[in-house]
Protein backbone atom coordinates (compact mmCIF):
# COMPACT_ATOMS: atom_id res chain seq x y z
CA UNK A 1 0.00 0.00 0.00
CA UNK A 2 1.38 3.41 -0.94
CA UNK A 3 1.95 5.91 1.86
CA UNK A 4 0.65 9.42 1.26
CA UNK A 5 1.51 12.20 3.69
CA UNK A 6 -0.49 15.36 4.12
CA UNK A 7 0.83 18.51 2.49
CA UNK A 8 1.74 22.08 3.33
CA UNK A 9 -1.84 23.39 3.37
CA UNK A 10 -2.50 21.59 6.66
CA UNK A 11 -3.69 23.71 9.51
CA UNK A 12 -6.58 24.56 11.75
CA UNK A 13 -9.56 26.86 12.05
CA UNK A 14 -10.86 27.97 15.43
CA UNK A 15 -14.12 29.57 16.50
CA UNK A 16 -15.34 30.73 19.91
CA UNK A 17 -18.66 31.92 21.30
CA UNK A 18 -20.34 32.42 24.68
CA UNK A 19 -23.20 30.16 23.51
CA UNK A 20 -22.51 26.48 22.66
CA UNK A 21 -25.46 26.09 20.25
CA UNK A 22 -24.46 29.25 18.37
CA UNK A 23 -20.86 28.01 18.19
CA UNK A 24 -21.86 24.60 16.79
CA UNK A 25 -23.78 26.38 14.02
CA UNK A 26 -20.98 28.82 13.18
CA UNK A 27 -19.94 28.80 9.52
CA UNK A 28 -16.84 31.02 9.68
CA UNK A 29 -13.87 30.70 12.03
CA UNK A 30 -12.50 33.62 13.98
CA UNK A 31 -8.95 32.56 13.06
CA UNK A 32 -7.21 30.06 10.80
CA UNK A 33 -3.61 29.02 10.26
CA UNK A 34 -1.97 26.97 7.53
CA UNK A 35 1.71 26.53 8.04
CA UNK A 36 4.41 23.93 8.34
CA UNK A 37 4.76 24.91 11.99
CA UNK A 38 3.66 22.78 14.91
CA UNK A 39 0.31 22.96 16.67
CA UNK A 40 -0.44 20.74 19.64
CA UNK A 41 -4.21 20.97 19.11
CA UNK A 42 -5.68 18.87 16.34
CA UNK A 43 -9.28 18.88 17.48
CA UNK A 44 -10.82 20.45 20.51
CA UNK A 45 -14.16 21.33 21.93
CA UNK A 46 -13.88 23.07 25.26
CA UNK A 47 -15.61 25.29 27.78
CA UNK A 48 -13.35 27.91 29.31
CA UNK A 49 -13.93 30.23 32.24
CA UNK A 50 -12.40 33.63 31.60
CA UNK A 51 -11.08 36.12 34.11
CA UNK A 52 -14.15 37.74 35.60
CA UNK A 53 -16.14 34.50 35.45
CA UNK A 54 -17.65 34.66 31.96
CA UNK A 55 -17.77 31.46 29.90
CA UNK A 56 -16.53 30.92 26.35
CA UNK A 57 -16.80 27.76 24.26
CA UNK A 58 -14.06 26.96 21.73
CA UNK A 59 -13.90 24.54 18.79
CA UNK A 60 -10.67 23.82 16.90
CA UNK A 61 -11.01 21.95 13.59
CA UNK A 62 -7.92 20.62 11.85
CA UNK A 63 -7.44 20.20 8.13
CA UNK A 64 -5.04 17.80 6.45
CA UNK A 65 -4.72 18.01 2.67
CA UNK A 66 -3.66 14.90 0.75
CA UNK A 67 -2.59 14.94 -2.90
CA UNK A 68 -4.19 11.79 -4.29
CA UNK A 69 -3.68 12.66 -7.97
CA UNK A 70 -1.07 9.90 -8.41
CA UNK A 71 -3.55 7.16 -7.43
CA UNK A 72 -4.59 5.45 -10.66
CA UNK A 73 -6.72 2.58 -9.31
CA UNK A 74 -9.78 2.69 -7.07
CA UNK A 75 -8.57 2.05 -3.50
CA UNK A 76 -10.11 -0.90 -1.69
CA UNK A 77 -8.86 0.18 1.74
CA UNK A 78 -7.22 3.11 3.46
CA UNK A 79 -5.89 3.81 6.93
CA UNK A 80 -5.59 7.20 8.60
CA UNK A 81 -3.43 7.17 11.73
CA UNK A 82 -4.23 9.77 14.38
CA UNK A 83 -2.74 9.87 17.88
CA UNK A 84 -4.12 11.84 20.73
CA UNK A 85 -5.54 12.01 24.19
CA UNK A 86 -8.75 13.15 25.83
CA UNK A 87 -9.37 14.58 29.27
CA UNK A 88 -12.69 12.74 29.23
CA UNK A 89 -14.73 10.65 26.82
CA UNK A 90 -15.78 12.17 23.54
CA UNK A 91 -16.37 11.46 19.89
CA UNK A 92 -14.35 12.88 17.04
CA UNK A 93 -14.96 12.41 13.37
CA UNK A 94 -12.85 12.42 10.23
CA UNK A 95 -14.84 14.19 7.53
CA UNK A 96 -14.00 15.08 3.94
CA UNK A 97 -13.81 18.80 3.25
CA UNK A 98 -13.44 21.16 0.33
CA UNK A 99 -10.94 23.60 1.78
CA UNK A 100 -9.57 26.37 -0.36
CA UNK A 101 -6.15 26.53 -2.01
CA UNK A 102 -5.03 28.43 1.08
CA UNK A 103 -6.71 27.43 4.33
CA UNK A 104 -8.75 30.31 5.71
CA UNK A 105 -11.53 31.19 8.14
CA UNK A 106 -14.19 30.39 5.52
CA UNK A 107 -13.04 26.75 5.45
CA UNK A 108 -14.28 26.19 9.02
CA UNK A 109 -17.58 24.81 7.70
CA UNK A 110 -16.25 23.30 4.44
CA UNK A 111 -17.27 19.79 5.49
CA UNK A 112 -18.82 17.50 2.89
CA UNK A 113 -21.87 16.16 4.76
CA UNK A 114 -25.40 15.13 3.84
CA UNK A 115 -27.68 15.69 6.81
CA UNK A 116 -26.64 15.88 10.44
CA UNK A 117 -26.17 13.02 12.89
CA UNK A 118 -28.92 12.93 15.52
CA UNK A 119 -26.58 12.45 18.48
CA UNK A 120 -23.17 11.34 19.64
CA UNK A 121 -22.77 8.88 22.48
CA UNK A 122 -19.49 10.13 23.98
CA UNK A 123 -17.87 6.70 23.76
CA UNK A 124 -15.20 7.82 21.32
CA UNK A 125 -16.41 5.22 18.82
CA UNK A 126 -19.35 7.07 17.27
CA UNK A 127 -20.02 6.87 13.55
CA UNK A 128 -21.42 9.38 11.11
CA UNK A 129 -20.55 7.25 8.08
CA UNK A 130 -24.04 7.55 6.60
CA UNK A 131 -23.77 11.36 6.60
CA UNK A 132 -20.40 11.64 4.84
CA UNK A 133 -20.50 12.42 1.13
CA UNK A 134 -17.71 10.57 -0.66
Please identify what each model-predicted range represents.
Residues 1-68, 100:
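Flexible, small-residue-rich N-terminal segments that precede or flank a structured functional core
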Residues 5, 25, 52, 82, ...:
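Generic detector of low-complexity/intrinsically disordered segments
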Residues 31, 46, 73, 113-115:
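A ubiquitous, low-specificity "background" feature that marks scattered single residues
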Residues 57-59, 72-74, 86-88:
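Extracellular/periplasmic catalytic domains that process cell-envelope and extracellular macromolecules
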Residues 66, 74-86:
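A short beta-strand element within beta-rich, extracytoplasmic domains
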Residues 86-134:
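Beta-strand-rich interaction/scaffold domains
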Amino acid sequence: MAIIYSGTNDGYAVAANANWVTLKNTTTASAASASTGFSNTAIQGSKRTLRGGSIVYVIFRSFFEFDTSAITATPTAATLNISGRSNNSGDFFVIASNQGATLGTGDYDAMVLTGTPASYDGSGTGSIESHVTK
